């Protein structure tokens, strides 16, 4: 028997500790606010600090001397995992703890409040009406007339003998619960996205086909999201320029190819207009010059890759070297800064000869050089986040629940004692509107019961004094 009691106590004690110690702590509003502030700070850091970049990038942009803000260096960023904030164990733990706090608050406060508001309550003492902010006494009025008036105004009523209770706007009590539920859905979507999503980048020349391989950030369960059964072909990449020579828009004509190489989808994307296929979204993010096609004298047209040069902040420039002798002992240099078709030609001594356009010939260092075409590369950001639809659902419910929360929960009580009717009410918001409604109900009740004009004036005067007293 003692052993059985000991086993029961070992099971009961942790449950008792949870209910008495842990649950009240989780449901504490101060904890929820603190966690919300921490999440906001972490989100800001993840927005300010570039996510998913290489170590070299952070070493260059966040050096040890001088440290940003006096403490933020590349070592601190890597130590605290600020280079991928939204996928760190500590950030996900904070989200889970915040979700637990919302859940505890819902079950310990919001649901009991809804249950209490949904109960039929009756007042049968004059003192109960005096304790209400709005109350009045009427002679020669009946509960039946009051019940009919309340029902016409959308109140749900219940009568028990000489007592009446009416209420409306119970949905306003449901609103806060749905607010919590929608926030939990948003948190769930964020966690799912962090654990199963990925982010990739590809620089692909026009005319080439690629599969997503350059993954720069991914969740621990993201493997199934990375496309393996289809590839992408860049049919064409081009840039529209303004009359002044500035870039107006980037365009990429993309095709989705199945395993057999057949086209199953096609779309031209540009900035803020991505392509979506099987949960993967491809954004137009960057561009580069991949290569230039040239011909030397009577040789066939051949393709030379172009590399981006370091201009120390002087803008983007790509260059290549064209051999003009079979032993590769001499060559001329070509430079290009955009896809408008202009190429700068330098001779073997490094002297600028001329600026030529695509489709033109030029004599340089004893050879005839033909510039056939500049080939651009599109920079694509490739992303999958299965949690986004869940987050959108949560935000949709959140907006709906906020509107629901603004619905006033109004309650009216009445008690008949001989020829005297006691009426009182309260609401959780829009007090002025509720006061006007009560006055109108009293007006209708007085008219229906043929109460004299002088008596109505006295009634409304007393009621107004009660309102002023409650406001003071």
UniProtKB/Swiss-Prot annotation:
A Pfam cross-reference name? ResB
Q: Which InterPro entries match?
A: Cyt_c_bgen_Ccs1/CcsB/ResB (IPR023494), ResB-like_domain (IPR007816)
**Looking at the UniProt record for this protein, which Gene Ontology cellular component terms does it annotate, in alphabetical order?**
plasma membrane-derived thylakoid membrane
Known PANTHER family for this protein? CYTOCHROME C BIOGENESIS PROTEIN CCS1, CHLOROPLASTIC
Give the family per the record: Belongs to the Ccs1/CcsB family.
- Could you tell me what this protein does? Required during biogenesis of c-type cytochromes (cytochrome c6 and cytochrome f) at the step of heme attachment.
- Regions that span the bilayer: 29-49, 88-108, 174-194
Q: Does the keyword Repeat apply?
A: no
What is the protein's given name? Cytochrome c biogenesis protein CcsB
Subcellular location(s) of the protein: Cellular thylakoid membrane
Classify the main location.
membrane
Task: Give the keywords, sorted.
Answer: Cytochrome c-type biogenesis, Membrane, Thylakoid, Transmembrane, Transmembrane helix
Q: Note whether Heme occurs among the keywords.
A: no
Its membrane topology is listed as: Multi-pass membrane protein
| Quaternary structure annotation from Swiss-Prot or TrEMBL | May interact with CcsA.
Q: Which GO terms describe its biological process?
A: cytochrome complex assembly
Q: Which domain of life is it from?
A: Bacteria
């Amino acid at each position: 028997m003692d052993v059985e009691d000991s086993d029961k106590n070992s099971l009961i004690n942790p449950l008792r500790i949870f209910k008495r110690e842990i649950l009240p702590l989780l449901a504490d509003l101060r904890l929820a606010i603190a966690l919300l502030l921490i999440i906001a700070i972490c989100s800001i850091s993840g927005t300010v600090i570039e996510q998913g970049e290489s170590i070299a990038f952070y070493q260059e942009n966040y050096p040890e001397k001088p440290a940003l803000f006096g403490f933020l260096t590349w070592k601190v960023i890597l130590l605290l995992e600020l280079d991928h904030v939204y996928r760190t164990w500590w950030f996900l733990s904070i989200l889970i703890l915040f979700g637990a706090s919302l859940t505890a608050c819902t079950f310990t406060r919001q649901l009991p409040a809804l249950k209490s508001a949904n109960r039929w309550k009756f007042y049968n003492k004059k003192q109960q009406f005096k304790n209400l902010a709005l109350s009045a006494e009427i002679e020669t009025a009946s509960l039946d007339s009051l019940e009919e008036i309340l029902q016409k105004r959308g109140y749900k009523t219940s009568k028990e003998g000489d007592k009446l209770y009416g209420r409306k706007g119970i949905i306003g009590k449901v609103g806060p619960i749905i607010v919590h539920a929608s926030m939990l859905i948003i948190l769930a979507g964020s966690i799912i996205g962090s654990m199963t999503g990925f982010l990739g980048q590809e620089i692909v020349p026009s005319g080439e086909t690629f599969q997503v391989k350059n993954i720069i950030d991914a969740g621990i369960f993201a493997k199934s999201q990375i496309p393996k059964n289809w590839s992408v072909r860049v049919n064409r990449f081009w840039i529209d320029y303004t009359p002044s020579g500035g870039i107006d828009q980037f365009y990429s004509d993309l095709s989705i190819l199945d395993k057999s190489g057949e086209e199953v989808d096609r779309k031209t994307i540009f900035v803020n207009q991505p392509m979506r296929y099987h949960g993967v979204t491809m954004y137009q993010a960057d561009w580069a010059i991949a290569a230039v096609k040239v011909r030397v004298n009577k040789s066939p047209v051949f393709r030379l890759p172009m590399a981006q040069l370091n201009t120390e902040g002087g803008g983007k420039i790509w260059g290549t070297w064209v051999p003009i002798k079979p032993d590769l002992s001499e060559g001329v240099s070509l430079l290009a800064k955009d896809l408008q078709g202009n190429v700068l030609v330098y001779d073997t001594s490094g002297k600028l000869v001329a600026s030529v356009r695509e489709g033109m010939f030029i004599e340089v260092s004893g050879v005839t050089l033909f510039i056939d075409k500049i080939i651009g590369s599109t920079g694509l950001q490739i992303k999958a986040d299965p949690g986004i639809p869940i987050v959108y659902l949560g935000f949709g419910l959140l907006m709906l629940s906020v509107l629901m929360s603004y619905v006033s929960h109004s309650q009216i009580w009445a008690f008949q004692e001989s020829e005297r009717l006691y009426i009182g009410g309260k609401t959780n918001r829009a007090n002025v509107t509720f006061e006007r409604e009560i006055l109108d109900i009293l007006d209708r009740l007085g008219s229906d019961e043929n109460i004299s004009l002088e008596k109505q004036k006295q009634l409304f005067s007393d009621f107004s004094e009660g309102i002023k007293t409650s406001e003071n």
